[in-house]
């Protein structure tokens, strides 16, 4: 998709704050500091629309980015971040679960994992949660440019096995540096919009 117009419409914490629109939505889920903001910025060809932070746990709301008046990316808080209180993490969990299980406009979830590392228990639980609720999901393994190409398949296999990955789902190696995987991710999104 050729992207020229992007707007952060709202940062929401409750359903009544969600945009009132019929546009399809794609949520981005992943551990804190896994590269969600870099993924968004690469997909929409912007350097800093989604703020990139060295400090994990920066996103604390559901951030609705309207793209080309055609769809929304919804950046959700990163899971598995230890430096926020347990109460805060539980609030985020409820907020994310409420959105994913009740939002009619949600067409799919882009689950972001780091190709360099074995997925965590939180990654596995998120994938399992999405499968349980029959939510279309694509797993995007980011930071492929940070490891030698010779390790891509080995690391991808570890990610798939750890998640108990469904071969019917889409799995994409991604790099915000080289833009590898960008077209495949857009293809998943376009298919869900048809």
UniProtKB/Swiss-Prot annotation:
Mg(2+) binds at residues 37, 59. This is Probable GTP-binding protein EngB. The gene is engB. It comes from Listeria innocua serovar 6a (strain ATCC BAA-680 / CLIP 11262). Necessary for normal cell division and for the maintenance of normal septation. InterPro entries: G_ENGB_dom (IPR030393), GTP-bd (IPR006073), GTP-bd_ribosome_bio_YsxC (IPR019987), P-loop_NTPase (IPR027417). Transmembrane segments: none annotated. NCBIfam families: GTPase_YsxC. Belongs to the TRAFAC class TrmE-Era-EngA-EngB-Septin-like GTPase superfamily. EngB GTPase family. Its cofactor is Mg(2+). Keywords: Cell cycle, Cell division, GTP-binding, Magnesium, Metal-binding, Nucleotide-binding, Septation. SUPFAM superfamilies: P-loop containing nucleoside triphosphate hydrolases. It comes from the Bacteria.
